Amino acid sequence: MMRILLFLATNLAVVLIASITLSLFGFNGFMAANGVDLNLNQLLVFCAVFGFAGSLFSLFISKWMAKMSTGTQIITQPRTRHEQWLLQTVEQLSRDAGIKMPEVGIFPAYEANAFATGWNKNDALVAVSQGLLERFSPDEVKAVLAHEIGHVANGDMVTLALVQGVVNTFVMFFARIIGNFVDKVIFKTENGQGIAYYITTIFAELVLGFLASAIVMWFSRKREFRADDAGARLAGTDAMIGALQRLRSEQGVPVNMPDSLTAFGINAGLKKGLAGLFMSHPPLEQRIEALRRRG
């Protein structure tokens, strides 16, 4: 119930704040003065509905998509002592974090990685790669699992879905304003919407969507520090630092995690310069230093 109320409150807040801001800056009058007959409030509501619908639909099917895209095999009956240990460890960490035990799976990948997903912290999935299980020590694997449980317990999947919904809303909204302005003012289309509207809107959505993704990734990086902190509480600070140091030693290994899951993986590769703005994870050095300061 609280998550539904949060979703509705976020939707309402986005629409109200944007509507008030546009009115204060006289945007409706500016558009009308330039011959653009556009009801901005109705457009904003339309964009909010579809913007949040897209992100929440992705959230609700995230477990299914994760299983399909990574080939994750869910452990229902452990066949080996490693699978038995994995289930017992996740059960213990979940209990300590105060959440229902998530589904546990293994996906076939050489890279050392793991992810958590799911629409609800009591209906989640935590999966680790075969490479991580084979090359990491039990303490390191436990720390990685604790990090992922931290994502689940912190409600990061829902939070990022709401952030993405806000971003989607404004990208759609401003892309359509730009499209209408170009179509009516520059190309002088009088009746309906001309081809310039559709071309400009699509182009604007691509450009604005690319730029707006930096906002989502910035927020994702902040959540990583929180998940590391949760991992340190559940598995121990030294173990969490050790796991990140081990990941740092494997940074040359290609990461093949689907883009839709990288925000909740433990390892998202390495980017430098401006590309770092579009990383879902902070540099490992920063994460290790934050844990050391934690003590």
UniProtKB/Swiss-Prot annotation:
It comes from the Bacteria. Keywords: Cell inner membrane, Cell membrane, Hydrolase, Membrane, Metal-binding, Metalloprotease, Protease, Transmembrane, Transmembrane helix, Zinc. It is found in: Cell inner membrane. Gene3D superfamilies: Metalloproteases ('zincins'), catalytic domain. The chain crosses the membrane at residues 4-24, 42-62, 158-178, 199-219. Its cofactor is Zn(2+). This is Protease HtpX. It comes from Pseudomonas syringae pv. tomato (strain ATCC BAA-871 / DC3000). The lineage of its organism: Bacteria, Pseudomonadati, Pseudomonadota, Gammaproteobacteria, Pseudomonadales.
